[in-house]
Design a protein with these regions (language model features):
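Enzymes that bind and transform nitrogen-containing heteroaromatic metabolites
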Residues: 2-10, 14-213
């Protein structure tokens, strides 16, 4: 399968674990003070954005398992102009920094460098780089999503659901979307798609928005 960079529409050589996401036209803070602000970072809205199949699979074997161009465009439109925070593997899957956004890469390596990106060695450091920013997006991978969820830092979840079950290669390590706890999160019915959007590439798709209870 050929995987395309969502901005350039060109093939990428190492599509490991990047998940194409989604978007709102505007992202109001659901509380007087956002979760990330309470943590001391002063970020207006800290959103997490991803795409998943019917089994909540994000990818497997270091690869994306689908090609849905309309969702790629939705991700680009949503994140344009805002910082994006991602793990090193997710960045490498893109093949390059995404233009029009601050690209912040999480890595434990002190030697890792890449053009047009900022390096952070912890989630805390990445959030500090974005202090007093109106909107920040977490764009992968599974480990980063899980850490943000466990710390209770996110203000908004934007989830693309794909009307498909991905074919996972045998013996592959599968990356799954984080669990959305219904005690903490509620579906925003005013913005979420009720019906599937038309098929694009491999699947029909819809966008679901979750806000804190």
């Amino acid at each position: 399968m050929v995987v395309l960079n969502p901005d350039t529409n060109h093939p990428v050589s190492n599509p490991c674990g990047w998940i194409p996401p989604i978007s709102p036209d505007s992202t109001p803070i659901p509380e007087d003070v956002s979760a990330s602000s309470r943590a001391g970072h002063g970020i207006g809205v800290l959103g997490m954005i991803w795409a998943e199949d019917k089994a909540q699979v994000l990818g497997a074997g270091g690869k994306m398992l689908w090609h849905v161009p309309a969702d790629f465009k939705h991700f680009k439109d949503t994140t344009m102009g805002s910082p994006i925070i991602m793990g090193r593997a997710s960045f490498l899957s893109l093949g390059q920094a995404l233009p029009g956004r601050r690209n912040i890469v999480l890595t434990g390596s002190r030697e890792f460098t890449a053009p047009d990106v900022e390096i952070a060695h912890s989630l805390e450091e990445a959030l500090e780089l974005c202090a007093r920013t109106p909107q920040v997006w977490i764009t992968g991978g599974a480990k980063v999503y899980r850490e943000v969820m466990e710390l209770g830092l996110a203000d908004l979840l934007v989830v693309t659901q794909l009307d498909m079950t991905a074919m996972v290669p045998p013996m592959s390590t599968v990356a799954y979307a984080p669990v959305i706890d219904p005690v903490r999160w509620q579906l925003d019915l005013t913005r979420s798609d009720e019906n599937w959007r038309p098929k694009s590439g491999d699947a029909a798709w819809r966008v679901r928005y979750y806000i804190p209870r």
